[in-house]
A protein has these predicted regions:
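Conserved lysine of the Walker
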Residues: 30-31
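Conserved pre-motif I regulatory segment
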Residues: 1-26
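A basic/glycine-biased coupling hinge at the interface between accessory DNA-binding modules
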Residues: 17-18, 39-145
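Post-Walker A alpha-helix
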Residues: 34-35
Length: 145
């Protein structure tokens, strides 16, 4: 465990009695606490990496956490460890359960650029502002479902 940690951070890392919310401001060491806790659970507590999930909001944060954990656990297998974004976790679950829902697991998810292209193709020769308005109408319809 890193000597750079303060007492509350070390306490959070060693806490094992249930869920734990780490709430702190930017730059306060939340990512360090989470990555150190993952290493602690695997190395010191013998937890299987496949029983650990760290979910974050951005791809950048997920990549940083993956790199930090890899550095902390160098030489230790992390097979099955999940460190990803909420969106990536959602897609993973949907792909795993796609057949049960009657879909193929190799489905595509459209981003805003893909949607713009489809609306543009369907609308024909209209200006960009009209295409954006059509996208908003479609979005409102979807939200009303």
């Amino acid at each position: 465990m890193s000597a750079q940690l303060n007492a509350p951070q070390r306490e959070a890392i060693r806490y094992l009695d249930g869920p734990l919310l780490v709430l702190a401001g930017a730059g306060s060491g939340k990512t360090r606490v989470i990555t150190q806790k993952i290493a602690y659970l695997i190395q010191d507590c013998g937890m299987k990496p496949s029983n650990i999930a760290a979910i974050t909001f951005t791809n950048k944060a997920a990549k940083e956490m993956q790199e930090r954990v890899a550095n902390l656990l160098e030489g230790t297998s992390t097979s099955g460890l999940t460190i990803c974004t909420f969106h990536a976790l959602g897609v993973r679950i949907l792909r795993e359960e796609a057949k049960a829902l009657g879909y193929k697991p190799n489905f595509s998810i459209f981003d805003s650029t893909d949607c713009y292209g489809i609306v543009s193709d369907l609308a024909g020769s209209v200006d960009k502002a009209t295409i954006r308005k059509l996208q908003n109408v479609i979005s409102n319809w979807k939200n009303a479902l």
